[in-house]
Amino acid sequence: MNSISIHQSRVALFEDLGLPCKKKTKSGYSTNAEVLEGLRSENPVIDCILEYRTLTKLKSTYCEGLLKAIQSDGRIHTSFNQVETRTGRISSLEPNLQNIPIRTELGREMRKFFIAKDGDVLVDADYSQIELRVLADLANDENMINAFNSGADIHTSTAAQVFNMPEEFVTKQMRSSAKAVNFGIVYGIGAFSLAKDIGVSRKEAQEYIDSYLATYSGVNKYMTHVIDLAREKGYSETLFKRRRYLPELNATNHMVKAAGERIARNMPIQGTAADIIKIAMIKVDKRLDDEKLDAHLILQVHDELIVETSEADSKKVLEIVTEEMENACQMKVKLRADGAIGKDWYTAH
């Protein structure tokens, strides 16, 4: 069986093995990743199919794709666009170096392909939970601000509040659920989606959300206020007053209007984070130039900056990059950047 072939996969799984059919499309039973994940407990062959598809994707898109992108100087040169995304994030294309996998260990291995030139190393620094820090600041939520500024683990702290127990009794599963709620709130997640993400009932998911919003009451008020403000002004804006106009808020179609409300909630958060990293890039570049260091900013991946520098200057460069990132702007919440040094991108990150 060719695991990439949809037809052959259907025949093998649903006819030959007699596995339950979870989802049907116009062309037949679906064998997409979501369906296969739901069938993992039915037969061990599912794991093999998923792994094969993952390896095939990594091989074709990243291994072979990146090899084709290497230019005559032995380097890969991408193009950056400042105005491609509506949130204000910088995007990368031809090739897109911002979508190198990071969620899985196998995917992260792809970063080993990217190495510094002889005698140099890579300095990599990224913001820690910048969108949640921005949310805490915009919402002026005292509990969340205090948690961040005290150096607490925000997901453990949230879990302790949501599950009403001391932090030392918070389990990994509780922290994982709290993490999903923390990040989900930024994107306007509902009980249905949260329940699906963390594997609980819709009722439990709603209880988590309600408990979260009771704990962080400032966030709750902010989420309502920011939509009302956007509806009144006709646009949503970042901390630095960059606007995104939202005609969707006046739509008669309920789904379009709901989408506009989600944008009104998360644009100030995502947009402010995007503004901050751009400010940090300017400050880092200027500082490296002012101090006449043999160092060059070579890549930005959303909340992450990568600098190529001489090994001799690497510790100084790491100090500069993290310092400028953390002081990119003044907020009620301290910004935090974590960094490392390595010969390749995998090691540096």
How would you name each of these model-derived features?
Residues 82-167:
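Function-dense linear segments that define catalytic or interfacial modules
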Residues 1-47, 214-262, 266-268, 308, ...:
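C-terminal polymerase-core module
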Residues 4-8, 176, 298-302:
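Short Gly/Ser/Thr- and Asp/Glu-enriched loop/turn motifs at secondary-structure junctions
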